[in-house]
Amino acid sequence: MCCSDASERLPKLRRAKQALWLLHYNTGFPKTEYPLVPNLVEIRDLEFAYGDRKILSNLRMDFPRGKLIAVMGGSGCGKTTVLRLIGGQIRPQRGEVRVGGEAVHKLNTEGLYRLRRRMGMLFQFGALFTDLTIFENVAFPLREHTNLSEELIRNLVLMKLNAVGLRNASKLKPGEISGGMARRVAVARAIALDPELIMYDEPFAGLDPISMGLTASLIRNLNDALGSTSILVSHDVNETFAIADYVYFMSAGKIVAEGTPAELRVSTDPYVKQFVNAEPDGPVPFHYPGKSLADDLGLGTQR
């Protein structure tokens, strides 16, 4: 009986090995080999503005291979703009962004398309196709960017969904699952092509504590399992500090502090201290700048 079982398993093992071989060598998956520079992403002396409104100023950041790096700061400080520059959606006025040694702003349309196939992106609110099933959402990048057979696509999608705990929900549509589950589907889609770089834009926004903790664990575990480099933009201190290797703090388009989560928890920098401890007043004031209340009430000159 055992020999019979073994003989039945051998063809399955061969098919599995063949599938893996096809996946990596003969399927249409991008075959770009980036130079093995220590930092997968480098930002140097970067300036970016919308017209006269300066968004980023003299930015310098490193994102080492295999690490999970967080970019934190208040709303409007330029965090998401950094992700858009890395993805080549916008171009800097000065300085450069390099991914795998390539200057992103110098790439033509074909070069950008090739580069983006090596990236995974989790958008702030998932951006799932609401008229497609969960399975079809995750299958979408595989069908767009590879020549895999439907059988292989099916197996890969089910494996990705299994990794986020939603294989048995594959036939449902996004409107039939919770917001936390939808975020996990978006994670599965982001890793569909086993990207070298994964960018997460506010992955914890709007999630309940259970979904938030689960999503944080997924991001860390997937980063390590895939050997990818992850860039995490977030406001959520506890979840981000629990999984990040290194953190950049931004304010008004500049890096105001950086370090490991442990270092930043004990930082004496006023901005970092206010942000980490959720203090209501500090470098980011409670009151909008302007006249004092006494002046506004006409009491400023009274004795």
Question: What annotation goes with each model-predicted range?
Answer:
Residues I198-D201:
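Catalytic Walker B motif of ABC-type/P-loop ATPase nucleotide-binding domains
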Residues D194:
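Conserved catalytic motifs of ABC-family nucleotide-binding domains
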Residues M72-G74:
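The feature captures the beta-strand-to-loop junction immediately N-terminal to the Walker
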Residues G87:
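Helix-to-loop junction immediately C-terminal to a conserved catalytic motif
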Residues E102-A103, E150-N168:
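Conserved ABC ATPase "signature" region
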Residues K173-I177, M181:
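Conserved ABC ATPase signature
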